[in-house]
């Protein structure tokens, strides 16, 4: 599905590259076909500036403001629509925050994370192996059940049912 987040005054955008990377702003005005004025009064580094459209990602949130509105009007519109709070709850915002936290982490924090991942993998493997020892899981059986389910949907004629029963009987006789 194609994203249809059109460029218009009031559209929230995320900066992709440069010193303001991953910051969110609002399109205040459209300069020409390639550039827009972007501002976020709640972020000190996002003062009103020109951004190239190749450098912004339009988000699905939009604020109702007029073109070239004042910073006060933009701040009021952002507060009333709560667009920044809605964006903060998205997966993209969480991913950006995680990336920032990972970049800001110390060597010891990265070591702790590595040890925690290794421990979690060990315990998951141990639990799976214990359950597998009690009731072995054959991936061939799982695949066979999936094939049977598909075949049951595909072949609903009497002849097909007989063929399926014959195959099942042959498999049981093999055991």
UniProtKB/Swiss-Prot annotation:
Source taxon at top rank: Eukaryota
UniProt keyword annotations, A-Z: Ribonucleoprotein, Ribosomal protein
Ranges annotated as biased composition (Basic and acidic residues): 152-161
Ranges for region Disordered: 150-175
GO CC terms, sorted: cytosolic large ribosomal subunit
GO biological process assignments: ribosomal large subunit biogenesis; translation
Pfam families: KOW (PF00467), Ribosomal_L14e (PF01929)
Basic residues bias: start-end ranges: 162-175
CDD domains per UniProt: KOW_RPL14
Gene Ontology terms for molecular function: RNA binding; structural constituent of ribosome
Described purpose of this protein according to its UniProt entry: Component of the large ribosomal subunit. The ribosome is a large ribonucleoprotein complex responsible for the synthesis of proteins in the cell.
Recorded family membership: Belongs to the eukaryotic ribosomal protein eL14 family.
Full protein name: Large ribosomal subunit protein eL14
The organism of origin for this protein: Leishmania donovani
């Amino acid at each position: 599905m194609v994203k249809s987040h059109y460029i218009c005054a009031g559209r929230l955008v995320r900066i992709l590259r440069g010193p303001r990377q991953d910051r969110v702003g609002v399109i205040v005005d459209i300069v020409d076909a390639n550039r827009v004025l972007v501002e976020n009064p709640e972020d000190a580094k996002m003062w009103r500036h020109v951004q190239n459209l190749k450098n912004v990602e339009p988000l699905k949130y939009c604020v109702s403001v007029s073109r070239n509105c004042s910073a006060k009007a933009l701040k009021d519109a952002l507060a009333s629509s709560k667009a920044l709070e809605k964006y903060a709850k998205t997966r993209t915002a969480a991913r950006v925050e995680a990336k920032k936290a990972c970049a800001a982490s110390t060597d010891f924090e990265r070591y702790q994370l590595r040890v925690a991942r290794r421990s979690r993998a060990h315990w998951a493997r141990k639990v799976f192996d214990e359950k597998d020892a009690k009731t072995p899981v054959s991936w061939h059986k799982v695949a066979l059940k999936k094939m049977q389910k598909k075949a049951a949907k595909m072949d609903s004629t009497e002849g097909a049912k007989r063929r399926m029963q014959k195959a099942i009987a042959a498999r049981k006789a093999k055991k």
